[in-house]
Amino acid sequence: MLSQIQRFGGAMFTPVLLFPFAGIVVGIAIMLRNPMFVGEALTAPDSLFAQIVHIIEEGGWTVFRNMPLIFAVGLPIGLAKQAQGRACLAVLVSFLTWNYFINAMGMTWGHFFGVDFSAEPTAGSGLTMIAGIKTLDTSIIGAIVISGLVTALHNRYFDKPLPVFLGIFQGSSFVVIVAFLAMIPCAWLTLLGWPKVQLGIESLQAFLRSAGALGVWVYIFLERILIPTGLHHFVYGPFIFGPAVVEGGLQVYWAEHLQAFSQSTEPLKTLFPEGGFALHGNSKVFGSVGIALALYFTAAPENRVKVAGLLIPATLTAMLVGITEPLEFTFLFISPLLFAVHAVLAATMATVMYICGVVGNFGGGLLDQFLPQNWIPMFHHHASMMFIQIGIGLCFTALYFVVFRTLILRLNLKTPGREESEIKLYSKADYQAARGKTTAAAAPETRLGQAAGFLQALGGADNIESINNCATRLRIALVDMAKTQSDDVFKALGAHGVVRRGNGIQVIVGLHVPQVRDQLENLMKDSLSTEHTTMTEAVS
C-alpha cells in the first residue's frame, strides 16, 4: 500500500516541474511592467515595450491558469503502466467529460445540490472555468482523483481484447467508453459532496491562519522529514497548488498578487500572512551550504578534494533550483539522525523568519523563485524584509555547520570522506577494482551508460514490473528484490542513494532521472524483443 502511495506522490511531481520556468517568466514580466524599475514611459499602455511584455506575460500564465487540466494530464505519465501517451489522451477526454457532466447537472438540478450555477465563477463563488466549461472549483483535488481513476481504468482495460467486429473500440477508445460511464456517477457525487468539502476547506484555512508560527513549524517539519518516504508531496501539494490556505494555492495566489504586493508599502506579512507556508525553500538555499561545509571540513584532509567534487554540484543544485535530494541522500542513510536534525533546523529557520515578518513564495531555489518572484520585484518597497531574511538565513547556515560538524565528530559518523571506502562508493573505477571486476566485464556498462548498469544491478528486464520517477528518483517495482545487487553497485554507477521497501526500490539519480528512465524502458523493450526473436527462431 505504501509503495502505491509513494508511486502516486512521485507522479504528482511531473506537472510540478512545469512551474519553475512559468514562475520565472511571470516574475520577470511583472517586474518589467513596474514603473519603479523601468520608468513611466516604458510602462505606458501604448508603449511597444509594455505591449511586448504583456504578450510574453500572458504566455507565462498558461500553467497557472490551467493547473487542474495540467495535473490531470500529467499524472498518467507516472501512473500508467504502459502507453502513457494514450493514457494522457484518455484522461484529458474523461476529465473534460466529467466537467461537462457537472455543468449540465448543475445547470439543470442546481437547486437540488444547493449550487447556483447562474453565478459568475469569481473567487468565493465555488465555481471556476476549465477549458471554457463552467464547473465546480475542485482545484487540483478533483483533477488528481479523476486522473487517478481513469489511469486505473487504462491499466486494467487498455489491453482487453474485444470481438473482431468491435475492434474499432479496442484500446484507448474502450478506456474512454468505460470512463464516460464512470464520469456520470462521479459528477453526481461531486455535486452532492464537494460543496460540503468546500466548507471544510474554509474552516481549515481559518485554522491554519490562526495557528501562526506553530502551524508554520509543523508544516515545514513534516515537509522535510517525509522526504525519504516520498510522502512529502502530499504535505506541500495542498498548500502550494491546492486550497489548503488560499484559493487556488499559494503559487498561483502569489503570482496573481505579485504586482500589487510589489507596489504596496504595507508589510508583506500584513498583506499575505499565509506566505509563511511557502518558506520551506530557505533550508535549501541557506541550510544546504552549512551542511555541505560541515561534511567537507569533517572529511579527512586527503579526501577533501573528492568530497568537494561530490558536494559542490549537489549543493548548487539545492541552492539554485531547490532540488535537495542529491545532497540529503549523501548523509541520510549513513545517519538518519542528521536528517531529523535537518528537518528540525529547517522548520525552526522558517518559523523564526515568519515571526520576524518574512513571507513570500520561497519554496524553490534562487533561480526559479527567490530572485525572479521575490527579491527582485519586491526590493523597492520590501528590501528590509529581504535583509532580515538573508541575515537569519546566514545565521542558520552557521548553526547548521556547527550542529552537523559537532554531531559528525562526537558520534564518529562515517559521512563521505571520513572513511576511504565511502569515497570509493562514488567512483566507478575504484568500485570495479575493489570488486575485482575485469575490464571485459566492465566494458558493457561503460558503453551502454548508466541506464544499462542500473538495469543489470536491478536483476535484468525480467525482474522489473514497473518503472516510475519523480524529480530525482527512479521508483521501481521488482519481481524479486533478492536478484538486485548491493547499494554499493548503484552508488558506483552514480546513484546518490538507494531506498528499499518490500519489492520496491528507489534509486536516487538526480535531475536527469527522466532521461535515465526513458533509457531503461528502451533497454527493457530491446531485451524483451531480443528474447522474443530468439524464441521465434528456436521454434522455427
UniProtKB/Swiss-Prot annotation:
The EC number(s) this enzyme carries: 2.7.1.-
CDD domains attached to this UniProt entry: PTS_IIB_glc
UniProt keyword terms in alphabetical order: Cell membrane, Kinase, Membrane, Phosphotransferase system, Sugar transport, Transferase, Transmembrane, Transmembrane helix, Transport
GO process terms (BP): phosphoenolpyruvate-dependent sugar phosphotransferase system
Signal peptide: none
InterPro entries attached to this UniProt entry: Glu_permease_IIB (IPR036878), PTrfase_EIIB_Cys (IPR018113), PTS_EIIC (IPR003352), PTS_EIIC_1 (IPR013013), PTS_Glucose_EIICBA (IPR050429), PTS_IIB_1 (IPR001996), PTS_IIBC_a_glc (IPR010975), PTS_maltose/Glc_sub_IIC (IPR004719)
GO terms, molecular function: kinase activity; protein-N(PI)-phosphohistidine-sugar phosphotransferase activity; protein-phosphocysteine-sugar phosphotransferase activity
Kinase recorded as keyword: yes
Membrane protein topology class: Multi-pass membrane protein
Domain (PTS EIIC type-1): residue spans on this chain: 1-420
Domain of life of the source: Bacteria
Residue intervals passing through the bilayer: 12-32, 87-107, 130-150, 174-194, 201-221, 225-245, 277-297, 307-327, 329-349, 352-372, 384-404
Subcellular locations according to the entry: Cell membrane
SUPFAM superfamilies: Glucose permease domain IIB
Domain PTS EIIB type-1: 448-530
Annotated PROSITE patterns: PTS_EIIB_TYPE_1 (PS51098), PTS_EIIB_TYPE_1_CYS (PS01035), PTS_EIIC_TYPE_1 (PS51103)
Principal location class: membrane
Active site per database record: 470
GO cellular component: plasma membrane
Domain remark from Swiss-Prot or TrEMBL: The EIIC domain forms the PTS system translocation channel and contains the specific substrate-binding site. The EIIB domain is phosphorylated by phospho-EIIA on a cysteinyl or histidyl residue, depending on the transported sugar. Then, it transfers the phosphoryl group to the sugar substrate concomitantly with the sugar uptake processed by the EIIC domain.
Function per UniProt: The phosphoenolpyruvate-dependent sugar phosphotransferase system (sugar PTS), a major carbohydrate active -transport system, catalyzes the phosphorylation of incoming sugar substrates concomitantly with their translocation across the cell membrane. This system is involved in alpha-glucoside transport. Involved in the transport and simultaneous phosphorylation at O-6 of the glucosyl moiety of sucrose and its five linkage-isomeric alpha-D-glucosyl-D-fructoses. Can also transport maltose, isomaltose and maltitol, phosphorylating at O-6 of their non-reducing glucose portion.
The protein's name in its UniProt record: PTS system alpha-glucoside-specific EIICB component
Organism the protein comes from: Klebsiella pneumoniae
